């Protein structure tokens, strides 16, 4: 059976000890995959996916971002990155984990997987650190609808001025997530947009480390990140030869029900990326790794990874 090893490393912010996990296979290591998780969640939720890949010869590593999971030092810190430049701190922490893991497994291909906010962080990462990756999987991503993001960033700035960057803002939370259930029939909870699997939704709601309201500071950081990854001059810094696999559900509001994911995919092609694939799952919602057809999703990811080794 695969085995888990938990460890910590010093964050780029010089203050926090970032919590991380490594899942290793019993036998030969064929490749490494690093996971960047989404907003208001943590890496323990990825344990089944990590085990699945480890059973197929992958070392899988992941860390709780600043303000998330076991990296957050208290409840107030949940969904807060830093007083200043938090987005870049989180991306730099991803790079630290990459370097630590690549040094440990120097002779095998290295992949990066990012989901939701982690997809935006991953898209930032491949701009700022384009080297050393055999491929990238981008899950549950979205597009930058310019004026909306600019307005959200301004609102977050005003909230920071009025209440401070660590303020957990109901206004920003509603702006970000308030409309996500609107297209579904028979809505049971406010988080039905995550997945059709009710047990997963209930576990998320019951988890004290999941579902924290976004702080003004983190929301401001994330809007800045969305602006950064949409600029042509930044996209041109990517290694165009790195394979990229976009995957999402066509019932995911974060990706505008597949339409925004298609636009990001097309933007990568227009930028000159040579190996880009898009997979949309019918009726799938935001967390395809936790959907009713997750076995199919796992198998598709593995098939793509294997094709790039």
Describe the function of each predicted region.
Residues 45-76:
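Conserved alpha/beta-hydrolase
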Residues 33, 37-41, 116-117, 250-251:
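Active-site glycine-rich loops that stabilize anionic/oxyanionic intermediates
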Residues 122-209:
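Alpha/beta-hydrolase-fold enzymes
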Residues 246-248:
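Short beta-strand/loop motif that positions the catalytic acidic residue
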Residues 105-116:
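Alpha/beta-hydrolase fold nucleophile elbow
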Residues 271, 275-309:
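Catalytic active-site module of serine/aspartate enzymes centered on a nucleophile-bearing elbow/loop
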Residues 1-27:
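N-terminal cap/lid segment of alpha/beta-hydrolase-fold proteins
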Residues 82-103:
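Alpha/beta-hydrolase active-site loop
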């Amino acid at each position: 059976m695969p085995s888990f090893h938990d460890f910590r490393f010093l964050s780029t912010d010089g203050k926090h000890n970032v919590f991380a996990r490594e899942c290793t296979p019993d036998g030969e290591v064929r490749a490494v995959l690093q996971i960047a998780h989404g907003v208001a969640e943590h890496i323990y939720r990825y344990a089944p996916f990590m085990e699945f890949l480890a059973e197929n010869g992958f070392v899988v590593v992941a860390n709780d971002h600043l303000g998330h999971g076991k990296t957050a030092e208290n409840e107030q810190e949940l969904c807060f990155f830093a007083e200043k430049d938090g987005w870049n701190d989180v991306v730099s922490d991803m790079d630290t984990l990459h370097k630590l893991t690549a040094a440990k497994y120097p002779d095998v291909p290295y992949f990066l997987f990012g989901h939701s906010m982690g997809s935006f962080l991953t898209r930032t990462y491949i701009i700022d650190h384009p080297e050393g990756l055999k491929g990238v999987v981008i899950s549950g991503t979205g597009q930058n609808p310019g004026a909306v993001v600019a307005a959200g960033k301004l609102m977050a700035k005003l909230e920071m001025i009025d209440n401070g960057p660590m303020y957990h803002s109901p206004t920003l939370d509603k702006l970000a997530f308030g409309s996500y259930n609107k297209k579904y029939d028979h809505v049971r909870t406010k988080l039905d947009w995550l997945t059709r699997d009710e047990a997963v939704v209930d576990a998320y709601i019951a988890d004290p480390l999941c579902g924290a309201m976004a702080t003004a500071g983190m929301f401001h950081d994330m809007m800045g990140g969305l602006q950064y990854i949409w600029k042509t001059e930044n996209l041109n810094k990517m290694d165009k030869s790195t394979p990229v696999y976009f995957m999402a559900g066509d019932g995911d509001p974060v990706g505008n029900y597949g339409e925004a994911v298609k636009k990001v995919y097309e933007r990568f092609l227009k930028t000159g990326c040579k190996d880009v694939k898009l997979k949309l799952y019918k009726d799938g919602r935001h967390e395809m790794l936790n959907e009713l057809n997750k076995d199919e999703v796992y198998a598709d990811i593995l098939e793509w990874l294997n094709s790039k080794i």
